[in-house]
C-alpha cells in the first residue's frame, strides 16, 4: 500500500505486549499512528508509547473501549488501515458469556462498523489466536488455516481459558462476514504463543505461560505440552507485511517453531543453567510428538522469519531480568514477579484477570 504521504493507521490495544511493539515498528517505517487505549491520561500505562522514536510527531493517543459502541469512530476516521490487537481476557470470569465472549465479538463488529463509517479504511488486520485452530479432543500432526477449533468440545470440557477460545473463534468468523459485507479487506493473523523482548511496563501474560518451566506455573504446562512459538518481532513484522501486501486476504498462521515441553525444558536447562527446570512431567509421555502450525501460506507470500526458539526466550528472559520481573536464579524465583502478580501485588494486577492482548486492562 504505497501512499504519496505517510499513511495513517489505527492500532487498538496499543499499550500492551503486542500492540506497543507493533506501534514501535510502524513508527519506524514512517506511519502516522493513532493508538487507542482505555485511559490516555494514565502515564504509567502509556509512557512507554510516548517515549518511542518519532512518537512526538507521528503518534497520537485516543481513548476507546471495546465495550462501548462507536468508541473507535473518531480514532479510525481518516485512517487507511486498522490493526485490531485488543481483546478481553479474564480466565476467572464468573460470567464469561457477558464479560468475555460477547464483548470480544461485539468489539470487532463495532470496529468494522467504525471502519465502514470512515470510508477511508482499506484493510483491517486482526490479531486472532491459535485457540481458534486446534482446540479439539485429538491433536493433529499439522494444522493450517483451514482448521477451526471444536466449539462443542470446548463447551463440554470448559478447560482453562475456554471462554477465550470460544470468543476468539466466534469473533473471527463474525468479522470475516461483516468485513465482506462492508467491502473491507480483512486479514486475520493466527499466532501461537508469542515470546520475545517487550517494551510495555507490565509482565505480559503470555510470558507467564512461556516461562512456566522457570516460574513454576505448573497449571500452564498443558499449554506448552505440545507448543508452537513465534517471536514478538516476527509477529509484528508479519502484521505490517500483510497490511502492505495488496494480495493478502483471509487467515494466516504466523508460527516459527514447535517444541514439546521436554524439548523446551532441555533448551532452557542448557542455555540458562541458573534456572532449575524440571526434566520429568507426570502424565506426559517422554516420546510426545510435536504438533505443528504450518506457516506455508505466509511464507509463500514472501514473508521471512528472523528468530528461532532460542532467540525468543533470550529476548523474553533478558527483558524480564532488566525490568525486575524475573529473578536471576531459581533460588529467587519464589520471590519473583510471577508469585507477586498472582497475589495481586504487582502494578495493581490480580493474576491474569482482565488483561488485554497483551497486558492492557479492557474490562472493568
Curated annotation (Swiss-Prot):
EC number(s) on file: 1.1.1.219, 1.1.1.234
Catalytic activity: a (2R,3S,4S)-leucoanthocyanidin + NADP(+) = a (2R,3R)-dihydroflavonol + NADPH + H(+); (2S)-flavan-4-ol + NADP(+) = (2S)-flavanone + NADPH + H(+)
Pathway annotation from the record: Pigment biosynthesis; anthocyanin biosynthesis
Keyword Glycosyltransferase: no
InterPro entries in the cross-refs: Epimerase_deHydtase (IPR001509), NAD(P)-bd_dom_sf (IPR036291), NAD(P)_dehydrat-like (IPR050425)
Record bears the keyword Metal-binding: no
Keywords: Flavonoid biosynthesis, NADP, Oxidoreductase
Family assignment from sequence similarity: Belongs to the NAD(P)-dependent epimerase/dehydratase family. Dihydroflavonol-4-reductase subfamily.
Function: Bifunctional enzyme involved in flavonoid metabolism.
Protein name listed in UniProt: Dihydroflavonol 4-reductase
Organism this protein belongs to: Callistephus chinensis (China aster)
Taxonomic placement: Eukaryota, Viridiplantae, Streptophyta, Embryophyta, Tracheophyta
Gene (name only): F
Amino acid at each position: 500500500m504505497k501512499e504519496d504521504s505517510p499513511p495513517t493507521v489505527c492500532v487498538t490495544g496499543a499499550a500492551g505486549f503486542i500492540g506497543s511493539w507493533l506501534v514501535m515498528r510502524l513508527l519506524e517505517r514512517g506511519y502516522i499512528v493513532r493508538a487507542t487505549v482505555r485511559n490516555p491520561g494514565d502515564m504509567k500505562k502509556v509512557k512507554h508509547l510516548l517515549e518511542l522514536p518519532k512518537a512526538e510527531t507521528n503518534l497520537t493517543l485516543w481513548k476507546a473501549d471495546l465495550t462501548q459502541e462507536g468508541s473507535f469512530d473518531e480514532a479510525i476516521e481518516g485512517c487507511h488501515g486498522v490493526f485490531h490487537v485488543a481483546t478481553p481476557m479474564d480466565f476467572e470470569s464468573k460470567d464469561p458469556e457477558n464479560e468475555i465472549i460477547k464483548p470480544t465479538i461485539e468489539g470487532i463488529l463495532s470496529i468494522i462498523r467504525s471502519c465502514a463509517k470512515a470510508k477511508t479504511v482499506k484493510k483491517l488486520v486482526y490479531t486472532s489466536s491459535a485457540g481458534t485452530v486446534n482446540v479439539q479432543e485429538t491433536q493433529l500432526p499439522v494444522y493450517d488455516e483451514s482448521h477451526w477449533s471444536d466449539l462443542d468440545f470446548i463447551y463440554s470440557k470448559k478447560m482453562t481459558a475456554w471462554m477465550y477460545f470460544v470468543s476468539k473463534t466466534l469473533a473471527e468468523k463474525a468479522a470475516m462476514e461483516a468485513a465482506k459485507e462492508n467491502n473491507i479487506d480483512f486479514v486475520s493473523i493466527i499466532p501461537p504463543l508469542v515470546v520475545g523482548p517487550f517494551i510495555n511496563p507490565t509482565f505480559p501474560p503470555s510470558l507467564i505461560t512461556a516461562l512456566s518451566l522457570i516460574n513454576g506455573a505448573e497449571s500452564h504446562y498443558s499449554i506448552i505440552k505440545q507448543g508452537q512459538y513465534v517471536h514478538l518481532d516476527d509477529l509484528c513484522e508479519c502484521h505490517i507485511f500483510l497490511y502492505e501486501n495488496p494480495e493478502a486476504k483471509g487467515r494466516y498462521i504466523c508460527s516459527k517453531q514447535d517444541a514439546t515441553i521436554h524439548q523446551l525444558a532441555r533448551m532452557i536447562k542448557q542455555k540458562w543453567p541458573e534456572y532449575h527446570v524440571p526434566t520429568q512431567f507426570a502424565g506426559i509421555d517422554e516420546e510426545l510428538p510435536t504438533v505443528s502450525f504450518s506457516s506455508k501460506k505466509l511464507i509463500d507470500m514472501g514473508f521471512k522469519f528472523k528468530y528461532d526458539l532460542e532467540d525468543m526466550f533470550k529476548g523474553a528472559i533478558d527483558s524480564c531480568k532488566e525490568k525486575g520481573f524475573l529473578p536471576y536464579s531459581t533460588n529467587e524465583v519464589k520471590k519473583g514477579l510471577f508469585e507477586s502478580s498472582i497475589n495481586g501485588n504487582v502494578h495493581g494486577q490480580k493474576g491474569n484477570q482482565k488483561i488485554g492482548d497483551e497486558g492492557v486492562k479492557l474490562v472493568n
